[in-house]
Amino acid sequence: MSKENDRPGRIQFAEEEVHGARIKVVGVGGGGGNAVSRMIASGLQGVEFIAVNTDLQALRANRAPIKIQVGGKLTKGLGAGANPDVGRQAAVEDTEKICDALEGSDMVFITAGLGGGTGTGAAPVVASIASQLGGDTGSVLTVAVVTLPFSLEGKRRMGQAMDGLAQLKECVDSVIAIPNDRLLNSVARNTPVSEAFRVAAVPADAEATGP
């Protein structure tokens, strides 16, 4: 289904393994949405892209052909305010839209940045929906590729991320979790913190590449 190449955590779709399969990549929240936009910009073929967000402005700017605003009634088109409970409730509010978008999938990849509101709270809901699409056969393979906060973001945000990760593990077949601190090993030591955060805005180590 997927391979890891020499870049840790990076997924490469192998043509011989996914031929004929209907693959959907779902970016949840800001970080996940950025990852999807980057994959599209890189020219990745053979998959369907979906962006899910509470933030209507960010959603409109996303490159994904399928955009799902969740929690419109709850957040009024704004973000989840770094509150995973709001993100979860938003996704639950629009479960039917998510289910419709994922229908017919053979494989579902979910990408998100954990620690904030929408990605942390909504990603497990999306994963749960995807995992149930196969019914009793469980035929839909569901994989989550997520990033964890920088340690300097504090214990609260990391705690939220770990809670979200635990919830994801209950719903998916496999999880790849990439600590953002690892990004510091791939950029110059004198890189400003602001630049490190810019790099982390796209889960680069979770980038999917075509055959």
Language model feature labels by segment:
Residues 1-211:
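Tubulin/FtsZ superfamily GTPase core signature
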